[in-house]
Curated annotation (Swiss-Prot):
Chain's role: Does not show activity on all the human nAChR subtypes studied.
Signal peptide span: 1-21
Primary residence: secreted
Tissue specificity field: Expressed by the venom duct.
Keywords: Disulfide bond, Secreted, Signal
Disulfide bonds: C46-C52, C47-C61
Subcellular location field: Secreted
Name listed for the protein in its UniProt record: Conotoxin G1.9
Protein's organism: Conus geographus (Geography cone)
Free-text comment about domains: The cysteine framework is I (CC-C-C). Alpha4/8 pattern.
Length: 68
């Protein structure tokens, strides 16, 4: 392999590892094997609890109005 070909392969490897690291959903903690916490909102349960409406401002429960 020539020098130009080796440089091209090197750039492709660097690009591939960069793309993989940015597209994975892991945070910096996952490198140590710790899970990254996520928040999942159950909208059915949230509709039953008016105090939950304050946390979820962009969701409107059907037939309900958020507190003022």
């Amino acid at each position: 392999m020539g020098m130009r070909m080796m440089f091209t392969v090197f750039l492709l490897v660097v690009l591939a590892t960069t793309v993989v690291s940015f597209t994975s959903r892991r945070g910096p903690k996952s490198r140590r094997g710790e899970p990254v916490p996520t928040t999942v909102i159950n909208y059915g349960e949230c509709c039953k609890d008016p105090s939950c409406w304050v946390k979820v401002k962009d969701f409107q429960c059907p037939g309900a109005s958020p507190p003022n």
